[in-house]
């Protein structure tokens, strides 16, 4: 039924003899897989989380803007982002333009070619992702002083400083700062970034989450439990990169 709806929508668009038709939204390329121009609107997941917390956006395919942000995040992490990442990988080689939507009301657009050039350069040189800080019930006070954070926010618990799935990456085009999810770099150049041994084991996924945990003058830290690699593979968290798909 959904497939028939998509086919019907595509035929309706193709039957138009004049004018410009803009198809936009999550999964728009499903509706019009062979478009004249493909603009991919991208946003870092930390910004998505901030908009969840401000009750500004819903998860994919539902109207749950007023739901608890923690539940929206779980749905995003385990459902929305898994689906959208797989679809993104099939589109990256087809992008004409990339849209930076991280600052509300101030979008920036760059050609896919120049964005790819920036990612390629990053894969071969030192770089860091954009860190973000988050409070927690057991958090401490040390990072406030060391990182010059907001003194009014109680208990900073986390500094996420190398979590490509959720951090962002700044690319500089002249005087313009262009922000994209740093996971785009992992998807685009996984072998160059990770090396063959790591890529062979984990695919185009960054296998480690680096973060600083502050418990100074705070509470006890939670117990961390990490799965075996075999279990991760069973959950299909790893998959071929778009470039390897092109090679095959």
State the predicted function of each range:
Residues 9-16, 81:
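Glycine-rich, anion-gripping cofactor-binding loops and their flanking helix/strand elements
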Residues 31-32, 91, 215-216:
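Solvent-exposed alpha-helices and their adjacent loops that cap or buttress functional pockets
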Residues 45-50, 62-67, 122-126, 235-236:
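Glycine-rich loops and low-complexity Gly/Arg-rich segments
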Residues 28-29, 54-116:
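Small-molecule kinase domains that catalyze NTP-dependent phosphoryl transfer to phosphate-bearing small molecules
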Residues 95-100, 104-239, 243:
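Transition-metal
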Residues 13-59:
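ATP-dependent NMP and nucleoside kinases share a basic, alpha-helical "lid"
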Residues 2-8, 237-247:
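Single conserved hydrophobic/aromatic residue that forms the stacking wall/gate
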Residues 51-57, 67-76, 128-133, 189-193, ...:
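Short C-terminal domain-edge/linker segments immediately following a structured domain
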